[in-house]
């Protein structure tokens, strides 16, 4: 061990020492932190950065050592140490309870705690945007928030090396006029963007996201897209983490969009993790949170909203095909879009309404595409909703209400279908033989999969949809069915494909939009995060040929993804514990990926 430490302090190149540092204290888990922290005397930013990653969650084991070492450090390392102490202090439960009685208490606190090192991090920002901001609810138009208060808030965020909410700043900001503060943040943000959004100054995104208005959060969406196209991965990743911490409706909608539609797997995973953390903080599952943020675009349950031009009023209706119908309430004239404003109209109201409608079609299309993917996932994994949650998601929301009418739903108990029904536009429910259905108060509801329906009932549902010329939102009733044999249901391993010859290229190209895969040790690992299950399909080479072996399922930990999951999993879940519809869907994917039925 001593030889290892001697090498760490030797004259070898910095790059090799960093590799060795991480090997000893991360990979090998050595805990001689005095040896690690001694490297801080060398005043290397890279060394500090690597040490921070190692000790960030080890305050109890390292803080006393750092306090003793502090007087021996140079200025840069001392500044770094103070910032680390602040991060730890901010994480303590007591920090979240900080409150200020009045604005004088805010002024005194900022005067006491503002630091030169931190203010140096905002020296590049213009001061004018935040020099004439009033206190919240201030009646004296000549009394402004002292500049050092806002400099404190900005500088504390800009000096951070880790992303976190600063409780003291969160307690200060409510004392400041919200609209003026947000306008100042917008001006500072635009100043940074005009300077090519320099990565070294990216921490300005923290106060912008944390304290920005919903319209400011919404305008981050096109920026994230442009940054991703320009391969500015650092900015995209940071912004997604901040949106997860913000967790406002627009922030979560942006993350959900990227979770479902991101072309890049890295960005998709970043959005998913930020969204997952937001869900955890709210005490919800990812899917429950995704349900809650489905936008209604300002429409009521019937898909209607009123638009005011000042002198004229219009009723805008979202139609079942997601087109728009506009009724002039004065003339009783119907059109497909809002008219241009007249001289007698309030021009600002009219132009804002027209601008919103112009983007509505695209936003509705994006949202319906996202919901299509989510419903396809639910059909596959058998996700269920309690009655009240189902009504709130599919009936109260006008977009989802139109979607729900062409789908067949089921009441389930212990995973078994009890009754199937369809929602009608008049608000009632019907059965396959067109009898009225009453939804039980304690109903647990899921999309019906054909594997759960008797052949006669399945045929009745198909006939009913045809008779009413309803086109299902997803191909629900035509989903392929691959049933397990009674013998297979009793075991934990599927051997039906054992010995099947497949092309190696098919294995390495195996991937679907909602399933992530990894190939390791001659095993194809297929991970489904919705069920926290990994399917493991092993194969073997015999000369130039490749043959499948066995397929079995294992559970994965909450939050594990394709990068962090520890494979292989030795545990084998009973096939009877896996939703039959999920196995059926997976077998269909395998049948399409490989010519297994030939």
Regions found by a protein language model. Name each.
Residues 1-247, 252, 259-598:
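Non-catalytic terminal/accessory regions
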């Amino acid at each position: 061990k001593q030889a290892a430490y001697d090498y760490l302090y030797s004259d070898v190149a910095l790059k090799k020492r960093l590799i060795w540092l991480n090997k000893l204290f991360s990979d090998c888990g050595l805990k001689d932190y005095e040896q690690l922290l001694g490297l801080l005397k060398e005043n290397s930013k890279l060394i500090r950065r690597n040490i921070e990653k190692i000790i960030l969650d080890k305050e109890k084991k390292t803080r006393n050592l750092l306090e003793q070492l502090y007087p021996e450090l140079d200025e840069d390392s001392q500044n770094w140490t103070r910032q680390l102490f602040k991060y730890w202090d901010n994480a303590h439960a007591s920090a979240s309870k900080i409150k200020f009685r009045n604005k004088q208490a805010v002024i005194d606190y900022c005067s006491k705690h503002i630091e030169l090192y931190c203010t140096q991090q905002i020296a590049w920002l213009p001061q004018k945007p935040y020099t004439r901001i009033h206190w919240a609810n201030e009646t004296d138009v000549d009394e402004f928030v002292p500049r050092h208060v806002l400099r404190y808030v900005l500088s504390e965020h800009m000096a951070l090396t880790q992303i976190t909410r600063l409780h003291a700043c969160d307690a200060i900001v409510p004392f400041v006029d919200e609209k003026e503060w947000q306008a100042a943040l917008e001006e500072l943000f635009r100043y940074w963007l005009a300077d090519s959004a320099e990565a070294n100054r990216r921490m300005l995104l923290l106060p912008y996201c944390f304290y920005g208005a919903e319209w400011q959060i919404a305008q981050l969406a096109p920026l994230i897209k442009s940054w991703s196209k320009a391969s500015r991965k650092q900015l995209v990743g940071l912004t997604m983490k901040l949106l997860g911490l913000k967790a406002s409706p627009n922030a979560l909608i942006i993350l959900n969009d990227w979770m479902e539609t991101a072309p890049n797997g890295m960005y998709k995973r970043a959005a998913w993790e930020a969204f997952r953390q937001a869900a955890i903080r709210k005490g919800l599952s990812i899917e429950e949170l995704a349900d809650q943020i489905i936008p209604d675009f300002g429409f009521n349950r019937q898909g209607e909203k009123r638009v005011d031009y000042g002198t004229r009023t219009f009723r805008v209706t979202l139609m079942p095909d997601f087109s728009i119908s506009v009724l002039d309430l004065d003339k009783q004239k119907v059109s497909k879009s809002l008219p241009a404003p007249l001289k007698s109209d309030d021009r600002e109201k009219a132009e804002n309404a027209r601008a919103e409608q112009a983007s509505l079609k695209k936003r509705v299309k994006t949202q319906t595409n996202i919901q299509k993917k989510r419903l396809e996932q639910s059909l596959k994994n058998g996700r269920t909703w309690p009655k009240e949650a189902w009504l709130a998601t599919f009936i109260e929301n006008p977009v989802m209400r139109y979607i729900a009418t062409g789908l067949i739903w089921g009441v389930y108990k212990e995973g078994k279908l009890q009754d199937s029904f369809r929602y009608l536009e008049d608000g009632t429910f019907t059965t396959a033989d067109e009898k009225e259905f009453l939804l039980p108060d304690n109903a647990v509801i899921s999309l019906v999969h054909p594997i759960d329906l008797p052949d006669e009932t399945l045929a009745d549902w198909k006939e009913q949809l045809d008779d009413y010329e309803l086109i299902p939102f997803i191909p629900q009733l035509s989903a392929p069915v691959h049933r397990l044999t009674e013998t297979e249901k009793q075991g934990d391993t599927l051997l039906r494909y054992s010995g099947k010859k497949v092309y190696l290229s098919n294995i390495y190209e195996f991937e679907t939009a909602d399933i992530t895969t990894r190939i390791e040790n001659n095993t194809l690992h297929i991970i489904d995060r919705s069920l926290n299950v990994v399917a493991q399909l092993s194969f073997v080479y015999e000369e130039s040929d490749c043959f499948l072996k066995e397929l079995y399922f294992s559970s994965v930990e909450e939050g594990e993804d394709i990068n962090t999951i520890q494979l292989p999993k030795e545990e084998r879940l009973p096939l009877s514990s896996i939703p039959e519809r999920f196995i059926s869907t997976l077998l269909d994917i395998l049948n399409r990926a490989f010519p297994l039925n030939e």
